[in-house]
Design a protein with these regions (language model features):
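Short alpha-helix plus adjacent loop in nuclease-associated cores
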Residues: 160-182
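The feature marks non-catalytic terminal segments
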Residues: 219-229
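Long, acidic (Asp/Glu-rich), low-complexity accessory segments flanking structured domains
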Residues: 1-15, 25-26
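Conserved non-catalytic scaffold segment of RNase H-like nuclease domains
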Residues: 15-52, 56-157, 181-205
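Generic recognition of well-ordered alpha-helical segments
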Residues: 165-168, 193, 217
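Alpha-helical transmembrane segments that form the membrane-embedded catalytic/substrate-binding core
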Residues: 208-217
Length: 229
């Protein structure tokens, strides 16, 4: 199987999914790619979302590990916390610096299952839903790289990126002079993006909490910007 290079995204998602169905060697991945992609004309109100967040040992998907994954299913009005999922997974690359950020310790990862062992449940939770992240170059690239390393398989999916939505609307609301001077946008970090919609402050760097925060942010963006598709 030809693995797509780091950060390369398919031009045609339907074609990519069809190719992966033919080439997949994992039952869970085969099932994932058999699920049809959401119709591009489907309305927001008819869409099932799942917010994905991860915690890692660093910022480089090719050098660092995932140590925690959080998933929160939701729609444009409701969040289904009873169906939310959270995993801490094993890693040999944990550093004192990363422990200070997310609070996941060597003891936690030593007692945790491997990422490979929980991948089928993660894939099942994502399949058939529109995945939502805050900064796709973290969540999607880390998941893609991990599956490529562990299973020698492609694991890619379309995402809605709340950071990109926020950046787009902030640019649109800039004054002409600010655009001309290439003035820097306000912070796009999840915490500050939420503040602009008067959402409550949550604990940072917990994968489950950040997934919830991302879900709430998209709901606020949908409502405030009257997004329909």
């Amino acid at each position: 199987m030809a693995l797509l290079p780091y950060q390369v995204i398919p031009n045609d998602w339907d074609e990519f999914y069809s190719e992966q169905v033919q080439e997949s060697l994992l039952e869970s991945l085969d099932t994932f790619y058999h699920q049809p992609l959401l119709d591009s004309q489907q309305t927001i109100g008819a869409t099932d979302f799942v917010a994905l967040d991860i915690e890692t040992t660093g910022l480089n998907a090719q050098q660092d590990d995932i140590v925690s994954i959080g998933l929160v299913p939701f729609d444009h009005q409701r969040i289904y916390l009873a169906k939310a999922k959270h995993w801490v997974v094993s890693s040999h690359r944990l550093t004192p610096e990363s422990v200070m950020v997310h609070g996941i310790t060597h003891t936690d990862v030593a007692q945790a299952p491997s990422l490979k062992s929980v991948l089928p449940e993660i894939m099942e939770s994502l399949q058939g839903k529109q995945v939502v992240v805050h900064y796709r170059y973290m969540e999607r690239e880390f998941m893609r790289t991990a599956v490529a390393e562990l299973c020698q398989q492609n694991f890619l999916f379309p995402v809605i990126d709340t950071l990109e939505i926020e950046a787009r609307y902030l640019r649109e609301n800039q004054t002409l002079m600010a655009r001309f001077m290439n003035k820097q946008l306000p912070s796009l970090r999840l915490l500050y993006a939420r503040e602009r919609y008067h959402l409550p402050a949550y604990e940072n760097h917990n994968a489950l909490v950040d997934a919830l925060a991302t879900a709430e942010l998209l709901q606020a963006q949908i409502a405030n910007h009257q997004l329909t598709k």
